[in-house]
Amino acid sequence: MKRKTLTQYLVEQQRSANALGPEVRLLIEVVARACKAISHAVSKGALGGVLGSLESENVQGEVQKKLDVLSNEILLEANEWGGHLAAMASEEMETIHLIPNRYPKGEYLLLFDPLDGSSNIDVNVSIGTIFSVLHAPHRVAGAEEVCEQDFLQPGSQQVAAGYAVYGPQTMLVLTIGTGVVGFTLDREMGSWVLTHENMRVPEDTKEFAINMSNMRHWAPPVRRYIDECLAGTTGPLGKDYNMRWIASMVADVHRIMTRGGIFMYPWDAREPGKAGKLRLMYEANPMSMIIEQAGGAAIDGTRRILDIQPDKLHQRVSVILGSKNEVERVGRYHAEAAQAPA
């Protein structure tokens, strides 16, 4: 059986009625090459001198790992010269990264979390890269400078989204708005090979992923749902659930993409002024597009995540995504709680 590479898949999409633009095709290929370089650095671990933390913090106030910084640099350097982008934004940087004047500018914006789950680097747990592609405003074609406001588009306007997961195998999961496909890195040949066509998330599940140690801080609708999961066959849901929690969004979502489940990183009463912990633009939006394209659902509790209009680049949000029926159940519990008398 002849194997289909990422390049072949993208060329086929470009030639089809879906009319994937050539700039998007080339952009995705560049991002995929950068992910190969990151995968190589991750796999070397201590042998490559990339483990451990730096003394610096990122814009989120989190201590940066060496691989965080290296991965960010790899993505910036790989993408700034190709002529596909007008600008980039990274979870690791406070402001946007403009394309240097010495390079041509393109019609798209790239956002990424260069190394999601980096707290797991030193303990050798699966981590990954998440990315999102948006259209740049038309005025950019007239050589006008891109600004942060240009990135503040709802997730429904994403052109493409994907993630690479660095585990026992390195995989790239991608959507261009026509379903979800998965590619596995052939390390000997150095190519991405299509191994998962038409990836789908089952509508029902018996698995949930959440950090149970924070249960006392959750909103009542989330506690209600988890209590019902824990009640098993004798409870209102009528089935036994298993809990899975890797503390790496890429790894947790990838498991859901391959076998179903619900991932929850809800609002937390310890920081009531924050809508959530995960970043809307770098994590929630791309993952929500992937999940929805695979037949799942993604909400913040009350709203579809892809409908949220961002008001700042590093905006945070509560995230509940995965198997459609389970996500909708949690949404109903939030709606019922909002309608209940005080």
UniProtKB/Swiss-Prot annotation:
Compartment list: Cytoplasm
Cofactor note (record): Binds 2 magnesium ions per subunit.
Cofactor field: Mg(2+)
Pathway: Carbohydrate biosynthesis; gluconeogenesis
GO cellular component: cytosol
CDD domains according to UniProt: FBPase (cd00354)
Transmembrane segments: none
Keyword Cytoplasm: yes
Binding site for substrate: D116, G117, S118, S119, N211, K277
Stored SUPFAM superfamilies: Carbohydrate phosphatase
Keyword Metal-binding applies: yes
Family: Belongs to the FBPase class 1 family.
Name assigned to this protein: Fructose-1,6-bisphosphatase class 1
Organism of this sequence: Bordetella petrii (strain ATCC BAA-461 / DSM 12804 / CCUG 43448)
Organism lineage string: Bacteria, Pseudomonadati, Pseudomonadota, Betaproteobacteria, Burkholderiales
